[in-house]
């Protein structure tokens, strides 16, 4: 082939963080087939879809089997019934949305990477440590990335203090992946004020909003003025166990002017919509009964987090998260590096976590554990770590 490839791909790591983790775990498992490995690494759920969701999927599947109720291509922006259900969900925690501003997606990850299609070569600001998709999708597009560091001193919740007034795309995730830290209303207000003053746009990832239990905002739109400077991305992956079912949404307020019609045009060209069966399942998950069941699952994962947090506290290991988040972000003991600690846990306890270095330079020396395992696996992992650490 004589065509020139996108040279920006040379700016990203050859493989994705979780692929690297999986490769090391696979190699260890092949070399030690007698060892039982407990996985507290990648944030995939383990509980099944809830009864309300399954009933809706069965009903929608039956509709697809009947010529009178069969549906083909879904609307690019989502069926009205689900857009309205999302708006009702936001209303349940005091945020008013126009259903017409809601765009149904196959999960937050895709739209977080694709939304930057709307922008020219503009500067991008990301927190560090950071979910790798924010960085890689912009490096692929050739953009310049600026980092604002999260650390123990600021509780891994960096603020715009000291930043220049350059307009930027600004990524914020709360509750944060990987650190589990949650912005207060005052903290988010500082970012909204900064974005309004500088003409920036916040790309707000609220994928873990259902885990919030301390009264912190569950949406950027709980902050006055955010509709003028923010797009919000959310997902049912962790709220309703949809990691393998795939459904979420992106909120693009009409107040953002040309951004919304541009996103409509982009989606009409590059997206064929989320399947009808999945959207009916999502509608059911967001119903009163569906959310009750979802919150029972979230309580299960939070109990797992409590078990892990109890161990870390017992060992005197500093950490964030685990209360309003499924993630626990801990300081590697003994001054160990992230991958060094990963190898120690895998080889000596057969417990898998995620090295903080994979989330950015500021993540070196830290480690992420997740609460998405089964109760039995979490208890066993805690027992093993109790003996090791």
Give names to the regions the model predicted.
Residues 68-194, 209-223, 227, 231:
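Conserved core of the PLP fold type I
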Residues 32, 141, 197-198, 315, ...:
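Helix C-cap/helix->beta junction micro-motif
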Residues 2-106, 114, 285-288, 389:
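N-terminal small-domain helix-loop-helix segment of the aminotransferase-like
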Residues 283, 298-309, 319-332, 363:
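Conserved glycine-rich beta-strand-loop-beta hairpin in the small C-terminal domain of fold type I
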């Amino acid at each position: 082939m004589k065509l020139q490839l996108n040279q920006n791909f040379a700016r990203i790591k050859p493989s994705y963080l979780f692929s690297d983790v999986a490769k090391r775990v696979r190699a260890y498992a092949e070399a030690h087939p007698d060892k039982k490995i407990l996985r507290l690494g990648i944030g995939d759920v383990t509980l099944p879809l809830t009864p309300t969701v399954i009933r809706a999927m069965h009903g929608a599947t039956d509709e697809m089997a009947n010529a009178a109720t069969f549906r083909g291509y879904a609307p690019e922006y989502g069926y009205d019934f689900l857009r309205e259900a999302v708006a009702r969900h936001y209303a349940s925690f005091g945020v008013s949305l126009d259903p017409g501003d809601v765009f149904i997606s196959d999960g937050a990850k895709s739209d977080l990477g694709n939304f930057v299609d709307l922008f020219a070569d503009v500067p991008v600001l990301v927190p560090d440590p950071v979910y790798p998709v924010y960085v890689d999708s912009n490096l692929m597009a050739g953009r310049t990335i600026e980092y604002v560091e999260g650390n123990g001193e600021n509780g891994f919740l960096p603020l715009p203090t000291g930043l220049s007034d350059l307009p930027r795309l600004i990524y914020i995730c709360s509750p944060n992946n990987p650190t589990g830290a949650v912005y207060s209303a005052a903290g988010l207000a500082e970012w909204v004020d900064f974005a309004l003053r500088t003409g920036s746009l916040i790309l707000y990832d609220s994928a873990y909003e259902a885990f919030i239990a301390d009264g912190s905002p569950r949406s950027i739109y709980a902050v006055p003025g955010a509709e003028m400077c923010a797009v919000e991305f959310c997902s049912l992956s962790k709220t309703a166990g949809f990691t393998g079912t795939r459904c979420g949404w992106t909120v693009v307020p009409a107040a953002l002017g040309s951004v919304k019609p541009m996103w409509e045009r982009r989606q009409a060209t590059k997206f064929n919509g989320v399947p009808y069966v999945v959207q009916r399942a999502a509608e059911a998950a967001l119903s009163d009964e569906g959310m009750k069941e979802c919150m029972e699952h979230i309580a299960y994962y939070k109990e797992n987090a409590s078990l892990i947090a109890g161990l870390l506290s017992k060992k005197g290991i500093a950490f964030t998260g685990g209360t309003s988040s499924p993630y626990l972000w801990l300081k590697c003991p003994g001054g160990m590096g992230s991958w060094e600690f990963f190898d120690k846990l895998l080889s000596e306890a057969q417990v898998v976590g995620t090295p903080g270095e994979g989330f950015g330079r500021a993540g070196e020396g830290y480690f992420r554990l997740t609460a998405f395992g089964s109760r039995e696996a979490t208890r066993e992992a805690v027992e093993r770590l109790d003996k090791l650490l």
